Amino acid sequence: MKKKFLKGLCCAFVISITCLGASSKAYGWDGKKDGTGTHSMIVTQAVKVLENDMSKDEPEIVKQNFKILQDNMHKFQLGSTYPDYDPNAYKLFQDHFWDPDTDHNFSKDNLWYLSYSIKDTAESQVRKFTALARNEWEKGNYEKATWYFGQAMHYFGDLNTPYHAANVTAVDSIGHTKYEGFAEKRKDQYRINTTGIKTNEGFYADALKNSNFDSWSKEYCKGWAKQAKNLYYSHSTMKHTNEDWDYSASHALKNAQMGTAGCIYRFLYDVSKDLLPTENHKINGLMVVIKTANEIAAGTDDYVYFGIERKDGTVQEWTLDNPGNDFEANQEDTYILKIKKPSIKFSDINRMWIRKANFTPVSDDWKVKGIKVIADGSVQYEKQINKWIHGNEKYYIN
């Protein structure tokens, strides 16, 4: 919200320091706006890997969904590079980092960072965009679904980057940018075409054992990110040699391709109905995605809240306020909300609402286009609102 002027000044100061301390971009593996580069190589090869590893005994519906993904390959590639060019992205790419041991990005772990911390991490973004992809896939919007899934795999690729898994930014070390440039120049040397196993064994088979997507995804990401973090300390710092960096990049990119193939395999099962049990798991948080309408003066600087009422009458409400300017016209904002203990099932929620409260005596009216509520690995609720919220108004979304 613009009213947080000091927050904006602080963030601007940090960005200026970053620009002085780094001569190039601060995000992970290289990716071009046209869907080429290291990120694109990772997802392209992952599809080839899965094609070569696919067991002949896979259900026909899985094969059909895989063919749909292959038919939308360019959208997958474009999605895999888009997060580095998203105009609404955090300026320092905080959500492209994730230390698997602290469960934070660098905005919480690095002492030089003076601005407000960002809750989103590379790991949480994998879950968010996979849920959005699954939602569109189930509606038959395969191009949009594949584009969303490409974004999920961008963040999965980032958490396989040694510097990103160790929360070492371009401010912390010039090695960050140099290492990723090193990998980009040699990426074609690091391509793989198979993991050496079939999808009915090894890590592929393990990917289907936990029906709770959020739980599975977090543990799956943690396993790969820990390897990347270890590679940073053992072979990837500025103290290491070119031979060390070659070892590091070859292993990190091999892991990214293998791990992405596993993510795709799990996704194919999740969108192929009735192949995995659909349990109503307990949740300890929600992701809320709100889109502001694309109209003149549709945005707001007033206070905005999201609330739930459980069936037992318990009420919880959160302030929706990300660092920077949220609720701008045509902007999509995501909020990670922690549910008070005890954990609940989504079906335990009776009502949900958004509420606006005036920041000044004069209302700054807000036009909401739509909302998505993500929990338990899926978009649990979605609504096209297309409504002006006036004054101190409370709007029930269900």
UniProtKB/Swiss-Prot annotation:
PLAT domain residues: 284-398
Annotated binding of Zn(2+) 3, by residue: 84, 96, 154, 158
Domain of life: Bacteria
SUPFAM superfamilies registered for this protein in UniProt: Lipase/lipooxygenase domain (PLAT/LH2 domain), Phospholipase C/P1 nuclease
UniProt key word Magnesium: no
Family: Belongs to the bacterial zinc-metallophospholipase C family.
Name of protein: Phospholipase C
